[in-house]
Amino acid sequence: MCARMAGRTTAAPRGPYGPWLCLLVALALDVVRVDCGQAPLDPVYLPAALELLDAPEHFRVQQVGHYPPANSSLSSRSETFLLLQPWPRAQPLLRASYPPFATQQVVPPRVTEPHQRPVPWDVRAVSVEAAVTPAEPYARVLFHLKGQDWPPGSGSLPCARLHATHPAGTAHQACRFQPSLGACVVELELPSHWFSQASTTRAELAYTLEPAAEGPGGCGSGEENDPGEQALPVGGVELRPADPPQYQEVPLDEAVTLRVPDMPVRPGQLFSATLLLRHNFTASLLTLRIKVKKGLHVTAARPAQPTLWTAKLDRFKGSRHHTTLITCHRAGLTEPDSSPLELSEFLWVDFVVENSTGGGVAVTRPVTWQLEYPGQAPEAEKDKMVWEILVSERDIRALIPLAKAEELVNTAPLTGVPQHVPVRLVTVDGGGALVEVTEHVGCESANTQVLQVSEACDAVFVAGKESRGARGVRVDFWWRRLRASLRLTVWAPLLPLRIELTDTTLEQVRGWRVPGPAEGPAEPAAEASDEAERRARGCHLQYQRAGVRFLAPFAAHPLDGGRRLTHLLGPDWLLDVSHLVAPHARVLDSRVASLEGGRVVVGREPGVTSIEVRSPLSDSILGEQALAVTDDKVSVLELRVQPVMGISLTLSRGTAHPGEVTATCWAQSALPAPKQEVALSLWLSFSDHTVAPAELYDRRDLGLSVSAEEPGAILPAEEQGAQLGVVVSGAGAEGLPLHVALHPPEPCRRGRHRVPLASGTAWLGLPPASTPAPALPSSPAWSPPATEATMGGKRQVAGSVGGNTGVRGKFERAEEEARKEETEAREEEEEEEEEMVPAPQHVTELELGMYALLGVFCVAIFIFLVNGVVFVLRYQRKEPPDSATDPTSPQPHNWVWLGTDQEELSRQLDRQSPGPPKGEGSCPCESGGGGEAPTLAPGPPGGTTSSSSTLARKEAGGRRKRVEFVTFAPAPPAQSPEEPVGAPAVQSILVAGEEDIRWVCEDMGLKDPEELRNYMERIRGSS
């Protein structure tokens, strides 16, 4: 139909409305053409349950406008899951079930790079040193397993092997992950020939994971081959010729600067501090006062230039502090060619640390420096500077935070429950040892609107008050003089939520009555003729049901305050948060509809309401969706049946996120074996172009029956939850067709309600290529003798849920019973038609296009009629010239006759019927107007009147010609017998005065008065 409509051509209409009419027709045809080309597919799928097991945090995700996915059908279903937290202890399982069948598979490991092999562990690698020197040729890398903790003694943790690649060769070293922390440090010594004396080179670091081995250390030998592309990158490390000095410079005043080492010192270690002096310093005496706590001593003061300065050292011991006084005297002058502002080394002060530091914990030793000049107060506070020395028995190299996850999905605004990520702080020693120092650190979040940190610095969290998300948000940690930063990605929901309903208008289902209090039109009391009818009177019409899903996009804002968002998975992906917000979702008007289990909307009575989700923190509305329940009636057109004889499952990894997993399950429908159990998946197709799985409806409201053409081919199945199932006792090589019918439940299946609402057919096994599968009937039809299993029937069988299952042989039906049930079906249809309340139906896009085309044709017809009326009115205004004399008389036809026969006039007058006698009058030629000539009056109504005027003028020197004007009046309805047929009626036009007709008399040659008088009498007699 669409092709014919789109391809039809019409002639271009004329008139001023023609172009507009063509445009309207073109638009209407285009609407119909687009609708035909974009007919959507039915959103059907196999309603099997897909769930993740042993996954700490995961979400179902879907693309916008793609649910179910395009590859779903009655026999298959696809779902995409997003796993956020890693699973280092146990691999999660994905289970697919459709009772009584179930299967499960292990989720494949993550793939961090497209070319890499999947690994079962999620590892974070941190390089401790950015550069190494020949004095310290060790490259240290910390490996951390993200996820939960492990109990002590866990023997399943793997080994991490570090690979260093240099143009001069390769080096390898491994470590085994330690329980509790789930971390280890590889300390790889780089060969000395890799270092260059003149330039800086670079070595690339990568790692691989391998199972732990027996023996010391738990890892294999270091003799490893090149890992190739399977190695995961760590980064690079610089190989420098010498160790750059690590120190800090602090000015004591405008002329003197203090340079101190910037590294922890160990007990018993000797170190020095240096004083720098500007060349423009002119004082000859300088005193330096140093105060130290117990455990630290000043051993010596040495001038850097003994020829210019001398130093004297004095020590004073106190109860809490030791004071050292160094007096410097100038011994010579500075060289004149040096720059005045240039700094030069002036004095070296040596310190030593005592061996005992308090049990291996790093401590600080404050050192107070103060300059004194002659004439200055000795305790001037403005010249004091305090320097803290970190003293530790361990060679601490770095402070590193260990987080269980590097990204956080902020669902706290939806649930009101804070989300936490545990954090631990460890120090890395020179020998590769790890020590936790979480209790001693300080911390601060760089952006509290995105992420917060706990007071104990052992976790970062979101509480629901955060306003946005971000990528790479920073949290700073510090311990003594060591600092470290942790960067995480926080995904925040974009509100409002999207609430998707499978049907936003719920209507009554014609003929489907269920037990319970009346929620729709009440049944008439006259139907209660017996006990069964009284029970059926308590039934009411079933309303449609709709599935509901709550979705939300998650995004991260840029840290620089820009507006460009980064979406989780992509801008067209949504996370299913139904399991989180279902406790906070409700129907605004519970009388109109109700929400069952947070997943199914049930219509109660006609009305308009909405489904809304309120925030548990502020009671604000997070999302809202309108819902209408009408007393319009729809019919169940057919049952779409899919037999399930087993479940198969496949899993695949996605590319948008490392935790993306897509699961697809199929229903196995091979030829059933004897005693094969078969489950039936049912979809209800309604007349309002919607479909719904039978799982949306209460099992007690479904009266289902299954029949087979072969007697004894099927038996009732055991309990299967919400699914309908049978046991096939045997099937031929070509398969077995099953007929499924939907009935009202048994208490409401009385009298006129015994006819099936709809039926469908399923084929067990693959149908032959030459014999197509039976079509799904749209109306109930009785099958030939067969075997039938009924659900919700009268017979009770253990194992059914909601309705009971029975088995009966259906070998023959009486004609009387069939006719009776057909009559009841017709009565039911008539009654339901009377119960229907006129209401606007759902209009599809195709119907809209047809209505638009019909409207265009109506407009064209209207324009044609208007043009016709305008045409008629326009030409009615144009009147003939002689209509002014008598506008009511019909317009005669004027004929002109030319001739030379003078007797023609007499011949015409003889044909005229004689009129009534006229009075005598004088000749107009003589009287000159003394009397009035008779005037020609119109004839009686319906009569025939003709008038002729003959005009002849005399031609010079020749024969006169005549011009005769003959006027024919409309023909009479019937001619008189005496009048000859075909004789024209002629009347002469006479005038009253002599002046008017004198020239006529002269032209006719009548000059004698007697001739004129006779002529006039003849004229009067003829008129």
Swiss-Prot record:
Biased composition (Low complexity): 515-527, 778-790
Protein location: Golgi apparatus membrane; Endoplasmic reticulum membrane
GO terms of molecular function: protein homodimerization activity
Membrane-topology annotation of the record: Single-pass type I membrane protein
Glycosylation (residues): N280
Signal peptide from the UniProt entry: 1-35
Pfam families cross-referenced by the UniProt entry: Ig_TMEM132_2nd, Ig_TMEM132_4th, Ig_TMEM132_5th, Ig_TMEM132_6th, TMEM132_3rd, TMEM132_C, TMEM132_N
Region (Disordered): 212-246, 512-533, 766-839, 905-961
Region Confers cellular localization similar to full-length form, residue ranges: 671-1023
Composition bias, Acidic residues: 824-836
Modified residues (Phosphoserine): S529
Cytoplasmic side: 874-1023
Residues passing through the membrane, by range: 853-873
Region (Binds to HSPA5/GRP78): 611-916
GO CC entries: endoplasmic reticulum; endoplasmic reticulum lumen; endoplasmic reticulum membrane; extracellular exosome; Golgi membrane; plasma membrane
GO biological process, one term: positive regulation of Wnt protein secretion
Basic and acidic residues composition bias: residue spans: 809-823
Reported function: May play a role in embryonic and postnatal development of the brain. Increased resistance to cell death induced by serum starvation in cultured cells. Regulates cAMP-induced GFAP gene expression via STAT3 phosphorylation.
PANTHER family: DETONATOR, ISOFORM E, TRANSMEMBRANE PROTEIN 132A
Similarity-based family: Belongs to the TMEM132 family.
Protein's name according to its UniProt entry: Transmembrane protein 132A
Species the sequence originates in: Homo sapiens (Human)
Origin organism lineage: Eukaryota, Metazoa, Chordata, Craniata, Vertebrata
